[in-house]
Amino acid sequence: MGLNATSQDWQNHISLYFPDVRLKSYVEIRNHDAQNTLMTLSIPAFWKGIMYNSDAMDEINKILSNYEYEDFMNLRKDSPIQGIQSKLKHIVIIDLIKEFFDISYYSLRENKKSEEKYLEPVYEYIALKRVPADNLIEEFNRKIS
């Protein structure tokens, strides 16, 4: 009556799974798919500010070295429920996000290419302690009420 799955179907299926980290010869960052137009350049600019500046990388490393593996696993467990109000040990994650964006901002500004402007849409969300999903949730709730 129906179709039976083949081993090739299974191979296709598992090729669509994107874990947080995959072993490759390069760094693949997949945490920001499908952002709105204003945010599209914010995330690559953020990563450029961090990854292309050894002082920025050292600063991030210094901050993150204060945490243990278990702290990150707790954050991973809590963040789908609590979002940016989740805590990494005792710090609310939105405060850590702001600190990271500040590091990236100053790094980009040092380059004198005016690329720090691409971080502005994220700073607007940070100031409001919101994320783009909050807008979608509000719109959805308006439509169903």
State where each predicted segment sits.
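C-terminal accessory/tail domains of diverse enzymes
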Residues: 1-145
